[in-house]
A protein has these predicted regions:
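Glycoside hydrolase catalytic-domain context in secreted enzymes
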Residues: 1-566
């Protein structure tokens, strides 16, 4: 039997205590930092090696989105983990993290509807099954921190990120969030235990410009903290990601009141607290707290922020020096490292650090049951707001017009935080996702925009190719209708774009409706995280109306007195 921290018979906490006593200051600082190999760095193992000379706490896997073969995903994780363990004096493996809201950003992973869509179904049992699929697929690739559920209570539909949430009701968010957390954390997958990281703690959607929140204590606890409390109490939530905003003038990432007194002492949270991307740096650069980034980093550590992501800003060499010379109490750092190590032992990473290979890997992905769960979730997300006798359509109808930019492209089915969206953003002239810069794939190429707007169009060859690679079997609405109803003639017309006032397609579309027995209109914008989206992270709205061109088209189409479905 192994002695010391390698003894698997000891509880994770005890193993962590033993290992902590053996570690140097350099190795401890490595454990509270993350690394994000972005763009070209993702493929450069020598550069990745140089980024973590003493190992690392966490590794971002966002750029796995670029890999078009599942086997390459597993190989990348294994190669990077080997570097981490080689460089760490005690061969401590890294936690690999990935988003989990709509499925993994991995080739052949199962995709799911957004949080707001799944909330429409109010089905905790299904939510737990979704989480189990996400957990199985990410764990197979060596990923054990899953950045979901999104437990923000969102009461203003102009907020671009509302689509990620379960909506405005804390009871609903509590039920679904707890179910999702259970699905992620229960049982072992590939010899490992995955852990859920709920976000964004706290009252993020009750802030002004995502920066400052004036939320009274009672509202904070009874509404905004309720889903987090439920996940902690009912599902044993092991991970928290604080929000970017300040609460009553104090950045959440640097707030002892929020991250320790409320979260740990009152709510009973015992897991790991990791920063949102760039949040520790934002304490200094955006909120203007602390004379230096290191001082802001020290404040975040004292507040209870265990790991800085995605790269080192505040938990830096200057802060290390402060621990070295006694300016800062090393017991603060030790408390953080102890929680990180405990999580790694709890996850089983010391015994199972690498992604699966071969058939074992494929079994987690090529799974008919996962597809059925995805379909059921999509069906339950549908809401019929009004029906004045138009539905179901009469069988005597022989010709139906299908109008709108979403109808002839399956790309627009995939909103923010889906794999499709993240791959699309590698061809975006600008990223709106926090902590991630714009990409270079379209440099020196002519950029097509939605007429009359600054929104980059996805109706080009590059994005057609992405769909064929990502979801080769995914049919558009028009294709599905034609397949399901071969006896009916469907007339397609583009009609109008996802935003703006362009009316150039009206004549053709109105003519199609005039010739048809009924018309199906696809309405709304495109949800995402980059310059191709009309709503999403970093892309808010001034109102909740449809785009002007779509409003005008509906008014014009209604004059034709044909049944309209939108």
């Amino acid at each position: 039997m192994e002695n010391g921290y390698k003894n698997t018979m000891l509880p994770p906490e005890k193993r962590a205590e033993i290992l902590l006593k053996e570690m140097s200051l350099d190795e401890k600082m490595a454990q509270v930092n993350g690394v994000f190999p972005f763009e070209d760095l993702f493929y450069d193992m020598k550069a990745i090696d140089a980024m973590m000379p003493f190992g690392i706490g966490e590794v971002s896997t966002l750029e796995m989105r670029r890999l078009e073969k599942l086997e390459d995903v597993a190989k990348w994780q294994k190669d990077v983990q080997e570097i981490v363990m080689k460089n760490s004096p005690h061969h401590i493996p890294a936690i690999f993290h990935m988003e989990g809201l709509c499925g993994a950003f991995i080739q052949d992973a199962t995709s799911f509807p957004s949080g707001i869509g799944r909330a429409s179904g109010w089905d905790p049992e299904l939510e737990e099954q979704i989480a189990q699929v996400v957990s199985n697929q990410e764990a197979a690739c060596g990923i054990t921190h899953i950045l979901a559920p999104v437990l923000d209570i969102s009461r203003d539909s102009r907020m671009g990120r509302q689509g990620e949430t379960y909506g405005e009701d804390p009871v609903l968010a509590s039920a679904l969030g707890s179910a999702y957390t259970k699905g992620i954390q229960e049982g072992e997958k590939a010899g490992r235990k995955t852990e859920s990281v709920a976000k964004h703690f706290l009252a993020f959607h009750n802030s002004t410009a995502g920066t400052h929140s004036d939320t009274p204590p009672r509202l904070l606890q009874e509404i905004y903290a309720k889903p987090f409390q439920a996940a902690i109490t009912e599902a044993g939530l092991k991970g928290i990601m604080p929000c970017y905003c300040s609460i009553d003038g104090v950045p959440a990432s640097a707030s002892y009141e929020i991250l320790t007194k409320l979260l740990r002492d009152e709510m009973g949270f015992e897991g790991v607290c990791i920063s949102d991307y760039g949040a520790v740096g934002n304490v200094h650069n955006v909120h203007h707290v602390g004379e230096t980034a290191a001082e802001a980093g020290a404040m975040c550590m004292k507040a209870g922020m265990d790991i800085e992501l995605p790269n080192t800003t505040g938990y830096n060499a200057e802060l290390k020096k402060k621990f070295e010379n006694g300016e800062e109490d090393s017991a603060i750092l030790d408390a953080l490292v102890l929680r990180v190590l405990t999580a790694k032992f709890r996850m089983g990473l010391f015994e199972h650090p690498f992604a699966l290979q071969g058939e074992e890997l494929k079994q987690a992905f090529y799974n008919e049951e996962a597809r059925k769960i995805s379909l059921r979730s999509a069906m339950e997300s549908l809401v019929l707001l009004k029906n004045d006798g138009t539905l179901p359509l009469k069988k005597t109808m022989k010709k139906i017009a299908v109008i709108g930019p979403h109808a002839n492209s399956a790309r627009k089915f995939f909103g923010g935080y889906t794999h499709m969206c993240m791959v699309e953003s590698t061809y975006a002239i600008e990223n709106s996702i926090a902590g991630v810069s714009g990409c270079k794939n379209l440099e020196n190429k002519e950029i097509v925009v939605v007429p009359g707007t600054n929104i980059q169009s996805d109706e080009t060859e590059e994005f057609d190719r992405i769909l064929k690679v990502q979801k080769p079997e995914c049919r558009s609405l028009l294709e599905e209708l034609q397949m399901q109803y071969p006896e009916t003639e469907f007339i397609y017309a583009y009609g109008y774009p996802i935003a703006g006032e362009d009316e150039s397609g009206f004549e053709e579309a109105l003519q199609a409706i005039e010739e048809a027995d009924a018309a199906i209109l696809t309405l709304g914008g495109k949800h995402g995280t980059c310059s191709m989206a009309s709503m999403g992270e970093g892309i808010d709205a001034s109102d909740i109306n449809l785009p002007g061109c779509q409003d005008k088209f509906i008014f014009a189409a209604s004059k034709l007195k044909k049944p309209l479905i939108g």
